[in-house]
């Protein structure tokens, strides 16, 4: 089976303090992502203009899709999700070819 990449781009809401957002991101990773079946790795980055990307590698596409659904119900994800500008979110899943 091929691995899957979950790539999410977004902006954070105006007024959110960077240390608070980074703490919420760490809580999402430790309290949710790493506990999901098939989790392999996570890379979290930003660039100028308040643009962020969250890339998670999963063992399978099914693992990625299951985790995405579970995240919406997770109390560990809620603080970070609450700081994200929802209309800016773009989520994609890709099959890893190499």
Range-by-range predicted roles:
Residues 11-23:
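Short, surface-exposed ligand-recognition loops at beta-strand->loop->(often short) alpha-helix junctions
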Residues 27, 31-40, 57-92:
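An amphipathic, aromatic/His-enriched active-site/gating alpha helix that lines ligand/cofactor pockets
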């Amino acid at each position: 089976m091929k691995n899957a990449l979950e790539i999410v781009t977004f902006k954070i809401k105006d007024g959110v303090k960077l240390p608070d957002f980074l703490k919420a991101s760490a809580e999402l990773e430790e309290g949710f992502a790493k506990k999901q079946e098939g989790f392999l790795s996570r890379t979290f980055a930003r660039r100028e203009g308040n643009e962020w990307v969250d890339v998670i590698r999963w063992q399978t596409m099914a693992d990625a899709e299951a985790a995405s659904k579970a995240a919406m119900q997770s109390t560990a994800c809620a603080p970070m999700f609450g700081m994200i500008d929802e209309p800016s979110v773009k989520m994609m899943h890709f099959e890893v070819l190499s």
